[in-house]
């Protein structure tokens, strides 16, 4: 009887006090989430693009190449080499800001469950925040007042140009975040055996 009580105590202790999650586990979850969001962004963009005529696609692509995304003002590495030289904290901070910048605009996206996208972005933002806190080494992450929203003028309109820009920018930014989180994970997890 004492063995049963002891076993139940140990089992309940394991449920009540689970082992803390490691950075490696958090990074794996974050990379998995952003990979999912990047796939959703790609699918949504290509679905929208394929609904357009070939001429409309060509015109919108030409216009988009001249325009820039509202998130372009977030300073980020410009190429693979600069990304690899960036600190883990810098990559996490940029990723956090990019994810945060899409929490509101993601509600206007078409081609997917917008609530699901917004929820995944919020979960990812929290996960990145936890990773930043675990890796900050006493440095201030950034002030709480740094929150911002991208200024997409006419969210939810039926204007193909605006929707094209919104989807293209979402796809571009999710690709950036996926790259930055993958590089940071590889740098902190030698067992990940990553080639960048």
Curated annotation (Swiss-Prot):
Write out the coiled-coil annotation as residue ranges: none
GO terms under biological process: animal organ development; growth hormone receptor signaling pathway; positive regulation of growth; positive regulation of receptor signaling pathway via JAK-STAT; response to nutrient levels
Among the Pfam families in the record, one is: Hormone_1
Q: Which residues carry this modification: Pyrrolidone carboxylic acid?
A: 19
The answer on whether this UniProt entry bears the keyword Disulfide bond reads: yes
User: InterPro entries of this UniProt entry?
Assistant: 4_helix_cytokine-like_core, Somatotropin, Somatotropin/Prolactin, Somatotropin_CS
Subcellular location as annotated? Secreted
Signal in keyword set: yes
**Disulfide linkage:** 69-169, 186-194
Q: What is its main location?
A: secreted
Q: Name one GO molecular function term.
A: growth hormone activity
Q: Where is the signal peptide?
A: 1-18
User: Which residues does the annotation say bind Zn(2+)?
Assistant: 35, 178
Can you supply one Gene Ontology CC term for this chain's record? extracellular space
> What keywords does the record list, in alphabetical order?
Disulfide bond, Hormone, Metal-binding, Pyrrolidone carboxylic acid, Secreted, Signal, Zinc
- Chain's role: Growth hormone plays an important role in growth control and is involved in the regulation of several anabolic processes. Implicated as an osmoregulatory substance important for seawater adaptation.
**Which PANTHER family does its entry note?**
SOMATOTROPIN, SOMATOTROPIN,PROLACTIN
Q: Which family does it belong to?
A: Belongs to the somatotropin/prolactin family.
- Protein name per UniProt: Somatotropin
Organism of provenance: Siganus guttatus
| Lineage of the organism | Eukaryota, Metazoa, Chordata, Craniata, Vertebrata
């Amino acid at each position: 009887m004492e063995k049963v009580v002891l076993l139940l105590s140990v089992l309940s202790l394991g449920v009540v006090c689970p082992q803390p999650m490691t950075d490696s586990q958090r990074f794996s979850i974050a990379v998995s989430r952003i990979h999912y969001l990047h796939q959703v962004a790609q699918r949504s963009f290509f679905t929208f693009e394929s609904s357009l005529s070939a001429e409309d696609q060509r015109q919108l692509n030409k216009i988009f190449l001249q325009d820039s995304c509202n998130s372009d003002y977030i300073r980020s590495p410009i190429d693979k080499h600069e990304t690899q030289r960036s600190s883990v904290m810098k990559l996490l901070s940029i990723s956090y800001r990019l994810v945060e910048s899409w929490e509101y605009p993601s509600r206007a996206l078409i081609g997917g469950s917008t609530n699901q996208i917004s929820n995944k972005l919020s979960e990812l933002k929290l996960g990145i925040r936890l990773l930043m806190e675990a890796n900050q080494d006493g440095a201030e992450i950034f002030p709480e007042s740094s929150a911002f929203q991208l200024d997409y003028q006419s969210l939810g309109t039926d204007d193909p140009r605006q929707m094209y820009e919104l989807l293209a920018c979402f796809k571009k930014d999710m690709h950036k975040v996926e790259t930055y989180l993958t590089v940071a994970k590889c740098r902190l997890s030698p067992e990940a055996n990553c080639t960048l």
